């Protein structure tokens, strides 16, 4: 039994809403996956801020129609397509998908779309090497902390240098008086 028009409109509206909140869309071929495997994929990407949507290519095309950011997605919509939508950790979702792909060996990454640009399979896989938001925060905090430590050492060193200079001068004066 097919979907009703109302149901299809709900799917398109849901996709549009998810796309508004997403930074990246990754399109995969899910042919050959069982329901349990699709559920496993969804379970793996959810903790890193991702959503897996499976809808007819026609409905996905309708959802991205008129939105310049997601237009390039249409070139990847062939056959059995699942769309992985990333709201938060771009690198984390690609890592989660690659882990799933390594275990199942049934899916194929077609490409992705980010900020209106089409990404090839290799470009999407390269996103896995990017540090997560938490790692970037830690790096920034470490850099700020090291700067403040250097400033504190520098401030402490100035009076010490002046004191050593005065001490050397007074010793020199005492030596010349003798």
Curated annotation (Swiss-Prot):
Keywords: Ribonucleoprotein, Ribosomal protein, RNA-binding, rRNA-binding. Coiled coil: none annotated. GO terms for molecular function: large ribosomal subunit rRNA binding; structural constituent of ribosome. It comes from the Bacteria. Part of the ribosomal stalk of the 50S ribosomal subunit. The N-terminus interacts with L11 and the large rRNA to form the base of the stalk. The C-terminus forms an elongated spine to which L12 dimers bind in a sequential fashion forming a multimeric L10(L12)X complex. Forms part of the ribosomal stalk, playing a central role in the interaction of the ribosome with GTP-bound translation factors. Belongs to the universal ribosomal protein uL10 family. This is Large ribosomal subunit protein uL10. It comes from Gloeothece citriformis (strain PCC 7424).
